[in-house]
Amino acid sequence: MNTPSNITLSKDKKLLTVTFDDTDYPMTSEYLRVYSPSAEVQGHGPGQETLQLDKQDVTIQTLIPMGNYAIAIHYSDGHTTGIYSWTYLYKLGSKNHELWLNYSNRVKEKDSNKNYHKVQ
């Protein structure tokens, strides 16, 4: 199990860089927020995930160490229940492109399935 050697939050609080094995994994606050491991986002089982929308302006307010295994991240939108294990942060960092593409496609699919009704 890898433990990060460094965790850095940018001054604007929109970019968290986590270093594992001399490799930096920069992740935006939006990306981390929409992939929060909390039950509020992930649900309590497969298929219960809640698509997080309009999180592009969210910033990271606080990073809280959770023993030697994780950090809790508190966000500017009030979300405070995500505890990011080192394993989960490594997954988010190493699969950033793939996971962001998946999220973007789900948002596009949701937008294309909207029914717009003209109000008369």
Question: Where do the protein language model's features map onto the residues?
Answer:
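Motif-centric detector for short Cys/His coordination patterns
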Residues: 1-120
